[in-house]
From Swiss-Prot:
Origin: domain of life: Bacteria
Classification via PANTHER family: GLUCOSE-1-PHOSPHATE ADENYLYLTRANSFERASE, GLUCOSE-1-PHOSPHATE ADENYLYLTRANSFERASE-RELATED
A GO biological process held by the record: glycogen biosynthetic process
Family: Belongs to the bacterial/plant glucose-1-phosphate adenylyltransferase family.
Annotated InterPro entries: ADP-Glc_PPase (IPR011831), ADP_Glu_pyroP_CS (IPR005836), GlgC_bac (IPR023049), GlmU/GlgC-like_hexapep (IPR056818), NTP_transferase_dom (IPR005835), Nucleotide-diphossugar_trans (IPR029044), Trimer_LpxA-like_sf (IPR011004)
Protein's name in the database: Glucose-1-phosphate adenylyltransferase
Catalyzed reactions: alpha-D-glucose 1-phosphate + ATP + H(+) = ADP-alpha-D-glucose + diphosphate
Name of the coding gene: glgC
């Protein structure tokens, strides 16, 4: 083993995100805008770069143009120092087919691993909102002697049925891993909590390569990291769980320590935005010691004119609020809210315009939506249901580029 372990980051960014439709109608899930200045992929990339993991392959597939462009424009590193973040589309190296699962994505990209020859592989998902120092997880992985380490977060057992659940012993060795079980296991120290997988893994390179190659030869496999690779390694006694609550991110507050959100549904996506807007936010975007990097557009500052009022909200650069009221909302860049309009409890994505006297409540407006003067969204449920998507929790979602 080399004195300084060599690490290659692999970001699994091929997710289709069907449950986020219509936000994923024209883009991959990791490319969905979030938080006024970011895309979902920016959180994992920021965590890796902040930890000085600067060789990163982002495996893409589904409607990846905007994701590829975002990475190319906003995540350029110094190639002279061997540093890179590069999007890698499906290579079709073993036949004329796309990735059949997350494990197959790595299998089709094994040449990247062979070329870099890393000691460890940091394999993280691309569609969660969180801060994490992966270097601490790597130290745990090396110290545990495991071939695979899974980042786990504790959730109430009643909420765990939607996740991959981890049954571990007192030492952290995983005894069983089950996708979405009806009866989730408790943790060794709290029977009312369950460790669920965050979709973040660290592998000793040979262990993962051997497992990936064996999985590729298994005609009965779905070629999924959580559903196939991890159970294979658990059965071999090679997997451990890393307790995310032990991860200490510089600059974290008591309010947002160990914050992690799976934003795979419209309601979860909306709720995670509402976590940003209070005086003491549940997730703090303003941590300068562990920054989240996002869009690098050269935009003018936001402007509030003619008595425009903004309370408990995040407003992106280039936005103009003119004699309008914005409360408990997240507005992305270049949003215009005209005279007399009201925006409450809503998420407005880049380039949207809310016309004079319009009302937007409990809604998500995708990029470049135009709401005409006096129009209402989130006010009349029956009318909204006829024209827009509505989440299980009642959030009205207007797709990209719609004129109302």
């Amino acid at each position: 083993m080399r004195e300084v372990p060599q690490v290659l980051g692999i970001v699994l960014a091929g997710g289709e995100g069907k449950r986020l439709y219509p936000l994923t109608a024209d883009r991959a899930k990791p490319a969905v805008p979030f938080g006024g200045a970011y895309r979902l992929v920016d959180f994992v990339l920021s965590n890796l770069v902040n930890a000085r993991y600067l060789r990163i392959c982002v495996l893409t597939q589904y409607k990846s143009h905007s994701l590829d462009r975002h990475i190319s424009q906003n995540w350029r590193l110094s190639g002279l120092a061997g540093e890179y973040i590069t999007p890698v589309p499906a290579q079709q190296r073993f036949g004329p087919h796309w990735y059949t699962g997350s494990a197959d994505a790595i299998y089709q990209s094994l040449n990247l691993i062979y070329d870099e020859d890393p000691d460890y592989l940091v394999v993280f998902g691309a569609d969660h909102v969180y801060r994490m120092d992966p270097e601490q997880m790597l130290r745990f992985h090396i110290g545990s002697g495991a071939g695979a380490t899974v980042a786990g977060i504790r959730v109430p057992r009643s909420d765990a049925t939607a996740f991959g659940c981890i049954d571990a012993d007192d030492s952290g060795r995983i005894r069983r891993f089950t996708e979405k079980p009806l009866k989730p296991p408790g943790t060794p120290d709290d029977p009312d909590k369950t460790f669920v997988s965050m979709g973040n893994y660290i592998f000793t390179t040979k262990v993962l390569v051997d497992a990936i190659r064996a999985d590729a030869d298994d005609d009965h496999s779905y070629h999924d990291m959580g559903g196939d690779i991890l159970p294979r390694l658990v059965d071999g006694g090679m997997a451990a769980v890393y307790d995310f609550s032990q991860n200490e991110v510089p600059g974290a507050t008591d309010w947002d320590r160990a914050y992690w959100r799976d934003v795979g549904t419209l309601d979860a996506f909306y709720d995670a935005h509402m976590d940003l807007v209070s005086l003491r936010p549940v997730f703090n975007l303003y941590n300068k010691r562990w920054p989240i990097r996002g869009e690098s557009e050269n935009l003018a500052p936001a402007k509030f004119v003619n008595g425009g009022s903004v309370q408990e909200s995040v407003v992106g650069a280039g936005s103009i609020i003119s004699a309008a009221s914005v409360r408990n909302s997240v507005l992305s860049s270049n949003v215009v809210v005209d005279n007399g309009a009201i925006v409450e409890g809503s998420v407005i994505m880049p380039g949207a315009r809310v016309g004079r006297g319009a009302v937007i409540r409990h809604a998500i407006l995708d990029k470049n939506v135009v709401v005409g003067p006096g129009e209402m969204v989130g006010v009349d449920p029956e009318r909204d249901r006829e024209h827009f998507a509505i989440s299980a929790g009642g959030v009205v979602v207007v797709g990209k580029g719609v004129w109302i």
